Design a protein with these regions (language model features):
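Conserved beta-strand-loop-alpha-helix junction that forms the acyl-donor binding cleft
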Residues: 112-125
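Conserved acyl-CoA
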Residues: 94-110
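Glycine-rich phosphate/pyrophosphate-binding loop shared by adenosine-nucleotide-utilizing enzymes
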Residues: 59-65, 81
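A conserved beta-strand-loop-helix scaffold within acyl/acetyltransferase catalytic domains
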Residues: 28-52, 57, 66-76
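A short beta-loop-alpha structural element at the N-terminal edge
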Residues: 1-16
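Helix-loop element at the rim of GNAT/NAT acetyltransferase active sites that forms part
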Residues: 16-31
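A short, internal acetyl-CoA/4′-phosphopantetheine-binding micro-motif in the GNAT/acyltransferase core
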Residues: 81-93
């Protein structure tokens, strides 16, 4: 399992994985809109300071997606890194390591991870 920054060629496969994982997530009350997801991923890939991080198995199949951004704090010029969205079947540890590497590369002083409000299958608690 490897994690790295994804590119435009990964968007279709990342969208399919997110759709599959969405069906069993705490977000199922919201309708999954694949066209909107593709548009958002394209924006993330092309925007400086934002990245689509992917975990892929040995066959190159995407197993996890972590959308990340690095920005300045509102109150000072120091930088922080945060996740926008994190969906993963496998390779979560590798994704977090890649996220930490990316944060360091962009000079982030702090990493802030969002935690889902609702975790019906207790996956988040088991992961962390």
């Amino acid at each position: 399992m490897k994690a790295a920054v994804g590119n435009y060629g990964d968007i279709a496969q990342a969208t399919r994985l997110c759709k599959t994982l969405h069906a069993d997530s705490s977000w199922t009350a919201l309708e999954f809109n694949a066209q909107h997801v593709r548009k958002q991923l394209m924006k993330i890939v092309r925007t400086d300071g934002m990245d689509m991080l992917l975990s892929k198995d040995d066959d190159g199949v995407i197993q996890g997606v972590l959308l990340a951004t690095v920005d300045q704090f509102f109150i000072c010029k120091e930088r922080y890194a945060t996740d926008i969205h994190f969906m993963c079947k496998r390779g979560g540890i590798q994704l977090l390591a890649e996220f930490k590497r990316l944060a360091r590369k962009h000079g982030a002083k702090k990493i802030i991870m969002g935690i889902a409000n609702d975790d019906p299958n207790n996956r988040i608690a088991r992961f962390y």
